[in-house]
Amino acid sequence: ANKEMDNVVLSIDGRKEVHDNMRPFRKGAGSYDLIVPKFQKFAESRNQDKYYVRGTYTHFNTDFSKDVLHLADLGFKQISVEPVVAQPTDAYALKEEDLPVLFDEYDKLAAEMVKRNRQGNGFNFFHFMIDLEGGPCVYKRLSGCGSGTEYLAVTPWGDLYPCHQFVGNE
């Protein structure tokens, strides 16, 4: 699979209780214990490059910096944790009153990343990888995202979509 897929995104939401709450199997059991060793093996097979573990934070885990750091503590070096896209009526949807906490979490995460980097135990956090002088590459400026060209979402059932936000749209 490494020669066919240049970059792979592995879905894991962070701490066991957070992940298992949002990504259980059909019968209700959590998936964390099954996927973590497989994801670790995959990341190592790529020498910690050309992959991301990608999680989603929700109203239920506004302390998401703990999830990012948990993933780093598991040995992952390429990490992305993003805000949930949800209907405002969904219990897990982020709310306006969550914003001060979320802003603080990004500050905590940045400080911890600097500390770990100085200790030789750094990791990449996708949303902090910004070219402050040139902005996004020309391709990103023109297209906005990689949906359908450099990004593909695969559901647990094997269905393919150009982006995770399109899953279920037929």
Predicted feature residues:
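Conserved SAM/AdoMet-binding glycine-rich loop
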Residues: 1-17, 48
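Radical SAM enzyme [4Fe-4S]-AdoMet core and its adjacent flexible, acidic
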Residues: 17, 21-33, 40, 44-157, ...
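A conserved non-catalytic segment of reverse transcriptases
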Residues: 6-9, 35-39
